[in-house]
């Protein structure tokens, strides 16, 4: 019996200018790419054309919905904005329902402070569960987001973050 690679897209959950989460998403995406037996795609919600005059499944984005339906699991990279998650991410997530059922999801929180997005993860978990996603035990926490990467977008403390991502991805898959 032939096995296919697991498809685990990474979703960058913010569209703000100057977003520090973009480098985190690229780092996480790179870590998934290094894993044997995995395929991935980086989905940036900034590039999705979602109308804002409706809600829920009425505004499904065909490509996003197809990608989520095909996925074996998901990784969300989410910045912490005043202890919460970006409204646009919630708007995008609400556009699908059946596509999420029983899929594993891991969340990487990003924050300027020292908690590594823990508070955004705490606030997002009930939403993910309500959507039918199965949340994993380990989180990806990225503290001090503005200082994590050098001017070329490379993570400074590669060893520490690679170890954390190895644990995170091991739990997810």
Question: What spans do the regions from the language model cover?
Answer:
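His-Asp phosphorelay/catalytic-motif detector in bacterial-type signaling
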Residues: 101-102
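Mobile beta-alpha loop/short-helix "lid" or hinge segments that flank ligand
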Residues: 41-50, 98, 132-152
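Short, glycine-/small-residue-rich phosphate/pyrophosphate-handling segment
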Residues: 105-145, 160
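N-terminal beta1-alpha1-beta2 submodule of the flavodoxin-like/Rossmannoid cofactor-binding fold
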Residues: 1-96, 155-173
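Hydrophobic transmembrane alpha-helix bundles
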Residues: 42, 73-86, 113-123, 141-150, ...
